Amino acid sequence: MSKLPRGGNHGTYDRRQLLRTAGLAAAGLTLSGPALAACQVGAGARSSTRSRSLKIGFVSPRTGPAAAFGESDAYVLELARTALGSGLTVGGNTYQVEILDRDGQSDPQHSAQVANDLINSDQVDLMLATSTAETVNPVSDACEAAGVPCISTVVPWESWYFGRGGKPEQKKAFTYTYHFCFGVAEFHNAYTHLWPQVSTNRRVGVLWPNDSTGNAIRQTLGPLLTKSGYTVIDPGAYTDGTNDYSSQIARFKAARCDIFSTFPIPSDFATFWRQAIQQGYHPKIAQTAKTGVFPSQVESLGAIGVGLAGAAYWTPAFPYTSSLTKVSSKRLGDGYQEATGKQWNQQLGPSLALFDAAAAALTAVSDPQDRQAVAQAISRLDVETPVGRLRWGNGPNANVVATPILGGQWRASAAGSKFPLDFVLCENSSDPMVPVATRLQPLR
């Protein structure tokens, strides 16, 4: 048995079982095997006086309000550690790779603290961060200040870029920090292709919080929806942790909002949605983002969770494969379910994609311990991942790759399923290569 080091109580996985369930054995990726052929490059030799080991930091929320985003971390980290077990070969030199994973606790201050510890005490060569602005933005800021290359994901890119001080006119606001994620354009595409599948009055009640994500969505998605012919009813920003939404619910009822859209933390949505049902607000479409991403979040709502519309940044239906592990999206989802007994969740894809990008960046330079060179390599990286092909330099700015997000719905699972709910894709406007399963059904 191989216990995962640091970063919370992950439990254990048997490596042979992991290789079998993930399909890695077929790809020849064993701990005793040679270094990954895909990670070999013909760069110049390094000085033998310096350590030939690399440290990769990984920060995600394992506890706190966003803990569901970290649910699959143990599985992904073990896949990455197994694939990197023989090290990375660069210019004829083999570098052993250590992954140092840390819990940001869904808290900006703690996320900044663990990032600074990884930078200053552990002296990581590359940082990875994922899941919500509360975790990702402070980690990215710490790396930018320290000159440590960082790749992050699962924060709408506008929240990451503008929330950290980037300006619309800047084509490259940051030197060391890079990001891949969906943005407002992808949400707009998803919503305007998903919502017309149900007959509505096109009046949208929105509940957008007073945080970096909510403010970015308010400034950008709201006007786009209006331009697309929707009437947006916005009762104003609310504070995370609000426990009484009566005034907002009354506003939505008075305006006869057939559509409801929100970007809250999970606990806030649970409070709002229960109060909405109790107070008689029953929209035809309830569109969630930031929450309603994971089965556990929706199952916790009971019957009122069935039929919620959501948005997927990855599912096992994505026709893409990890370049590091050679595991397909379907096998990634199946392997997780076989190894853990839990239902697949969206975070599997982008979390593994971080390690695809990390391996590609570290092997794209002659000296993987040259932080400036690694950062420059990320800026022109082109790598295959479970979420699709990531190509920096072709995005909305030089720091960002915009990735798809697709609209879908939580449905009761078919008879005989191991799990009570299933997320089905209903539109694919941001990536037509991903198959659609069905059409959106109204809540009422």
Task: Give the positions of each predicted feature.
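Extracytoplasmic "Venus flytrap"
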Residues: G57-A80, R102-Q109, S131-T132, L207-A216, ...
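Extracellular/periplasmic periplasmic-binding protein-like sensory domains
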Residues: A276-L352, A364, D422, C426-L443
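Extracytoplasmic ligand/sensor domains, especially the bilobed periplasmic-binding protein
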Residues: V124-P235, I285-G310
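Beta-alpha junction/loop-to-helix N-cap segments that form part of ligand/metal-binding clefts
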Residues: V41-T49, A68-D73, G87-G166, Y238-Y245, ...
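Short, charged, surface-exposed loops that flank catalytic or proteolytic processing sites
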Residues: T363-Q376
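Solvent-exposed, acidic/polar segments of extracytosolic/periplasmic ligand-binding ectodomains
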Residues: D382-R444
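C-terminal segment of N-terminal export signals and the immediately downstream linker at the start
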Residues: P34-V59
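N-terminal secretory signal peptides
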Residues: M1-Q17, A26-G33
